[in-house]
Amino acid sequence: VYKRQVIGGNGAGKSTMLNAVAGVWPVDMGKILIDGQDVTRLSEHQRAKYIGRVFQDPMMGTAATMQIDENLALAARRGLPRTLKIGITKKEHDTYYELLKTLDLGLEERMTSKVGLLSGGQRQAVTLLMATLKKPKLLLLDEHTAALDPKTAAKVLTLSEKIVEENHLTTLMITHNMKDAIKYGNRLIMMYEGHII
């Protein structure tokens, strides 16, 4: 498991690098390889089968007006052919219940609650589950605890570490916190003015 921490000041290019890896921004030179596969020319939605992502803003990555279980179902069905079938099967419900239980936030008892009613930390935890549900080749964590209070941020970081370790996920995590970079990463990437130094 490679856990690389990307650090650098504001405007150093950290989020731009993640956006290039995710396919949001095209690159004008070089290649982007994920697990040996050249994804440089693939669009963002084509890369989605390789990448899980959690954003800095807890409001991104989930559909606020949908229920927790519906959000998880969207993530589980990502990359599959679209059908007219709607709803969540009993098997899916049971799977999501067990997944949510591992978070230890009581969300398994609130599966039909709208995601928009959750706290920032609860929402980031659900987003983390959604991003890792399909066992991506690469998990991108873009300052995913920056908008949370210190206690909640610590809990989300612990959950992140647990999920990454259990699923053997290669991860790129952007952080401004050097202590977190050292604690959770096994390699550090320092950026300055758009370059890795």
Residue ranges and their predicted role:
Residues D38-G52, M60, R82-K85, T89:
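ABC ATPase NBD coupling module
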Residues I7-G9:
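The feature captures the beta-strand-to-loop junction immediately N-terminal to the Walker
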